[in-house]
Regions:
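Catalytic cores of nucleotide-sugar-dependent glycosyltransferases that transfer UDP/GDP/TDP-activated
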Residues: 1-178
Length: 178
């Protein structure tokens, strides 16, 4: 077993119980989270799961790292995988890219309709309960919705339903693909 020297409030003990998450936070060199805002949130009592004090004590070693793309690899000015190249100064190729995306996903091809896109984990934590609440109203507007991700069956079912219910306006793909 573990020695008594670890059973202290500055190591493993947390409110009378062993807490291995606390131990991980205590013994890690740095602490990373999925975003800068989440790094701040977990330092509050509401999101800190009783570890907020420890996280605040180590706030200079807590970092949020944004998910993102490699701008060199996904640069529309040089990306050979897209139908047409474009830049901030010359957007002429962007319309062709949009039209091909709409066609490939079974959306109505329309250069004037805005596309709302989401790539990520389909989870209540991402606020998708709010999308569930307003999806009917949202899709009554002149918009299209593209969802790419994997996650909770509740949201897979929601977006599968929406794709059938709002033909030509919603496309959902349940895999991580670029």
């Amino acid at each position: 077993g573990l020695g008594d020297s670890l059973w202290t409030d500055d190591k493993l003990e947390c409110y009378g119980c062993a807490n291995f998450m606390k131990a991980a936070l205590v013994y890690s060199d740095i602490i990373t989270t999925v975003s800068p805002s989440y790094a701040e949130e977990i330092q509050t009592a509401y999101y800190g799961e009783r570890l907020d004090g420890l996280l605040r004590a180590r706030k200079h070693e807590v970092f949020g790292v944004l998910n993102g793309i490699d701008m060199a690899d996904y640069n529309p000015a040089t990306d050979a995988r897209i139908p047409a190249e474009y830049t901030a100064d010359d957007l002429s190729g962007k319309a062709k890219c949009k039209a091909e995306l709409q066609e490939k996903l079974g959306l109505t091809v329309d250069p004037n309709v805005p596309i709302i896109g989401m790539v990520g984990r389909l989870s209540n934590q991402k606020g998708l309960d709010l999308v569930d609440y307003i999806i009917g109203d949202l899709m009554s507007e002149n918009v299209q919705l593209v969802v790419l991700g994997m996650g909770e069956s509740r949201y897979v079912n929601l977006f599968s339903w929406a794709e059938g219910e709002f033909k030509g306006k919603v496309a959902a793909r349940f895999a991580m693909d670029h």
